[in-house]
């Protein structure tokens, strides 16, 4: 079974990278750890944690989306509702709420969801954001919760992966065939490594 480490990165879109930097780096305090591109096409990554990042593409003509409260149902083509970012302590939830209030930005009251406490806001691009802290003593990883009043038959199979529902791998890719192809950013990082080696000599 594959062991996931977290969300390597989420990729969003902005038409105004400067206001995005002001919010994510300067207000929320997330380091800007990667910046690639040029006018007309950029992608910047902000550090959420040691393993998790959020990225923004900047494309010409992009406008902020219409703000929609998290969890409010809509119809038509849709695949995204909101992003929730975890906080280490309950105090940090209130510290963050105070920062949003001081900045003149809307922030919800602290909401009790039974297993997390949360506040909600929006970033400059209209993205609905939730900031959450796990309630002490509620361990859904150890004791999963299923409170759906009418779960499907597939849901009733349980919380654990049903590995027999997909075809098994019959032939694994041998090491000598594991080719990796260059993608956007690879040349830049290679050049940075060369420059670093030169300065270190």
Indicate where each model-derived feature is located.
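Histidine-centered metal-chelating micro-motifs
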Residues: 43, 106-107
């Amino acid at each position: 079974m594959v062991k996931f480490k977290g969300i390597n990165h989420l990729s969003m879109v902005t038409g105004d990278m400067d206001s995005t930097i002001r919010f994510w780096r300067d207000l929320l305090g997330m380091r800007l750890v990667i910046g690639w591109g040029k006018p007309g096409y950029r992608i910047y990554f902000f550090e959420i944690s040691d393993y998790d990042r959020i990225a923004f593409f900047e494309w010409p003509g992009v406008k902020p989306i219409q703000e929609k409260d998290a969890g409010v149902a809509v119809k038509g083509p849709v695949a995204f509702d909101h992003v929730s970012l975890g906080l280490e302590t309950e105090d940090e939830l209130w510290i963050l709420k105070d920062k949003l209030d001081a900045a003149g930005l809307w922030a919800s009251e602290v909401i009790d969801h039974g297993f997390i406490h949360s506040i909600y806001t929006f970033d400059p691009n209209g993205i609905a954001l939730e900031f959450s802290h796990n309630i002490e003593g509620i361990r859904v990883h150890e004791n999963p919760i299923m409170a759906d009043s009418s779960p499907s038959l597939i849901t009733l199979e349980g919380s654990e992966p049903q590995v027999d529902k997909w075809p098994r791998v019959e032939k694994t890719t041998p090491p000598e065939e594991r080719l990796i192809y260059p993608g956007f950013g690879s040349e830049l990082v290679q050049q940075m490594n060369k420059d670093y080696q030169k300065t270190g000599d």
